[in-house]
Amino acid sequence: PNIAVLGADRNGRLINIIRDDGALECSNLKIVRIDGSLYFGSIEKIADYFSKIYDANDIQYVLIAADGINFIDLAAAEWLTNEIRKWQKNRGGIYFAGLKLVSQDVLKKGGFLDKIGNNIFYKDKKTAIAEIHEKFDKPCKMKVFNECVL
């Protein structure tokens, strides 16, 4: 799968930061877009990416822009559950915006939602950002989103 970090452009639109060097990233929330299926063959790449974010120890929250995730198999659901629980225990958390219902069903039917909770899923990025922003325990370093107060 393709993994892209999103930042806000000067119009407030979320955009791949590689495509706009003026795009701003939040100091408390990393927004990551994943395009492609999450399955046993793709988990290593994604796990490595999330390990780097976690090990950097400067981000409390991750929002996965998940409208590009077409499928999640049981191996990926197991990894996601463990990763989400690790972030919930030691940081702020991992959240999803726009995850297709068919992918949520895999998590639900496999019993994974019982472990991670249903409150980490949002229909859209805007709602997710607004609600996650309320959880911040560190002040914003820069005004990236409308919710940010300096």
For every predicted segment, state its role.
Residues 1-150:
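Cytosolic C-terminal regulatory domains/tails of membrane transporters and channels
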